[in-house]
Amino acid sequence: MTTSDLPAFWTVIPAAGVGSRMRADRPKQYLDLAGRTVIERTLDCFLEHPMLRGLVVCLAEDDPYWPGLDCAASRHVQRAAGGVERADSVLSGLLRLLELGAQADDWVLVHDAARPNLTRGDLDRLLEELAEDPVGGLLAVPARDTLKRADRDGRVSETIDRSVVWLAYTPQMFRLGALHRALADALVAGVAITDEASAMEWAGYAPKLVEGRADNLKITTPEDLLRLQRSFPH
């Protein structure tokens, strides 16, 4: 499948979190990564893709860092109000897409603001494998280490079969209307939603797992940032 055969898509980037585990003076998406902020590098892969229709970044109220970035002035990038939880931010982003002319059956890719090492190859693979899928899915990586379940005392209660375990990454790709309904209904029901796929699962869907690169890391700790520094030219 050539690039022109890939489906057009919209992107939502929830970026209202503070990243307290980084112990930094600013949210982790605004930390320096080889001379540019993390979020700028995160957006690059999407803004350089010819099938992108538009991108919405969901920001905290009075975010002082975003306005000073070059990408904030891009005609492809719009803002939406971030929420208390990830699901709230994504819902806000989906509503903004509808205001921009997106349709309920359009594809939307939701991606972590602090996951800056997404490759064009992984993005194209996700788009190609899900282009005709009735549900959608997500990039994921098969578990490679032995997995243990712990009891309340921190002791091993069982060994889990890793052949059926995958690590959920992003982007996660679903139809706008279906994802909006799943997130909204889950929030009303008080269901704990950790990512978009979990909302779709709760709504009765079975998202498809698309294998991606293990180095598509989400920055959570200072060690993660240090590891990714080596991936980008200075």
From Swiss-Prot:
GO biological process: isopentenyl diphosphate biosynthetic process, methylerythritol 4-phosphate pathway
Reaction(s) the record says it catalyses: 2-C-methyl-D-erythritol 4-phosphate + CTP + H(+) = 4-CDP-2-C-methyl-D-erythritol + diphosphate
Site (Transition state stabilizer): 21, 28
One Pfam family recorded for the sequence: IspD
Keyword Nucleotidyltransferase (UniProt): yes
GO MF term (any one): 2-C-methyl-D-erythritol 4-phosphate cytidylyltransferase activity
Metabolic or biological pathway: Isoprenoid biosynthesis; isopentenyl diphosphate biosynthesis via DXP pathway; isopentenyl diphosphate from 1-deoxy-D-xylulose 5-phosphate: step 2/6
Assigned keywords, A-Z: Isoprene biosynthesis, Nucleotidyltransferase, Transferase
Classification via PROSITE patterns: ISPD
Functional description taken from the UniProt entry: Catalyzes the formation of 4-diphosphocytidyl-2-C-methyl-D-erythritol from CTP and 2-C-methyl-D-erythritol 4-phosphate (MEP).
Family membership: Belongs to the IspD/TarI cytidylyltransferase family. IspD subfamily.
Matches recorded under NCBIfam families: ispD
Protein name: 2-C-methyl-D-erythritol 4-phosphate cytidylyltransferase
Organism: Pseudomonas aeruginosa (strain UCBPP-PA14)
The gene coding this protein: ispD
